[in-house]
């Protein structure tokens, strides 16, 4: 783990002393896990009655953020909370529904490229606007400074700060 001055979205983080209290570490982890679980359950309802499942939304989130709305299948899989075979089956169902296309990756003979169709992108944007409002409502209890700190801390835990 890195120590010292690190930076987050709000600038440098103060010097991080090594963790010494294992009980506090476990309590913090359990609290983070419970918060994530509760928020995830709440957010899941954002997709009730929409044209996309949460998993389909997650695929389109990765794909629409990529250049030319095209991402490698392994990038999509890396952003999902399900296994690679499950992602592959999900993408195949999305192809059948006309939400994405899938083709061989010319730069990687074993890989595939996933591209959002116009229909998939339109549906994604419509749901994304509502989903973003829902997330903002859930996060409104935190100040901008707390949100920046939360972002920095979770990035640090993911080791990509």
Where in this protein do the model-derived segments appear?
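Short, locally clustered residues in the helix-turn-helix/winged-helix DNA-binding domain
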Residues: 33, 61-68, 128, 155
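Short, charged, intrinsically disordered terminal tails
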Residues: 159-160
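Alpha-helical hairpin
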Residues: 21-24, 52-54, 116, 142
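N-terminal leader segment of winged-helix/HTH proteins
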Residues: 1-50, 97-99
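N-terminal helix-turn-helix DNA-binding core of bacterial DNA-binding proteins
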Residues: 41-83
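Charged, amphipathic alpha-helical coiled-coil/dimerization segments
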Residues: 40, 92-155
């Amino acid at each position: 783990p890195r120590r010292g001055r690190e930076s987050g979205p709000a600038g440098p983080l103060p010097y991080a002393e090594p963790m010494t209290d294992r009980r506090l570490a476990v309590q913090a982890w359990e609290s983070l896990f419970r918060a994530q679980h509760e928020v995830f359950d709440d957010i899941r309802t954002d997709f009730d009655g929409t044209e996309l499942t949460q998993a389909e939304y997650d695929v389109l989130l990765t794909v629409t953020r990529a250049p030319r709305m095209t991402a490698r299948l392994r990038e999509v899989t890396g952003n999902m909370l399900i296994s690679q075979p499950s992602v592959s089956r999900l993408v195949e169902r999305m192809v059948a529904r006309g939400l994405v296309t899938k083709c061989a990756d010319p730069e990687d003979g074993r890989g595939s490229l996933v591209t959002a169709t116009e229909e998939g992108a339109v549906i994604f944007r419509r749901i994304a606007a509502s989903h973003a409002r829902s997330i903002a409502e859930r996060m409104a209890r935190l100040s901008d400074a707390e949100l920046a700190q939360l972002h920095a801390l979770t990035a640090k835990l993911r080791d990509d700060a």
